Amino acid sequence: YPICWYQDKAKLLTKGQVAAVSTDTGFSLVCRLDDKEALDKIRLIRQLSEKKHFTLFCDSLSQMSKLARVNNTGYRMAKSVTPGPYTFILEATKEVPRRLSHPSKKTIGLRVPSNKALHALLEKIGEPLVGTTVIMPGEEEPLSSAWEIQDRIGDQLAFILDDGTSVIGDTTVVDLSGDEPEVIREGLGSVSALGL
């Protein structure tokens, strides 16, 4: 897509607006970090409780480190595998709205996706996006194509971004909030690449 296309899409993701974007692990519903109205809309689409945790999509480790505290070991680990299909659980900074972090642990899941289209959109927006996988209420499998998303919930979205590179699967989740890194879920990201 041309650069101007991303600028137009970035402008569309205004207050209260939700988009579906392809990531390196499937499609996610996303909105701006500080947009409670849009976040509530995502909860409504997916029928999620207030306890559901969301992931922050960042365009770089630099942006990620403004939102979370990470020690040198964790930073080196994240740097070695990002961008890529990994979600890192870290202690949130004050930059993260409290409604997004874990209520007792004050942690948040962050990732730097590797697909170019989402990366370009993140750069144009200039801030992280909050997201969750596009799984419809009562279903176990995520929606896996743009046309399927358009058919089911297209009227509730500002736009659908599909760069055709999406692979459906889970991210590998690594908790870096404690003393030692801990793999919470093994997904598309190689655990051996983490050096664990």
Where do the PLM segments sit?
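Active-site-adjacent structural elements in enzyme catalytic cores
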Residues: Y1-L196
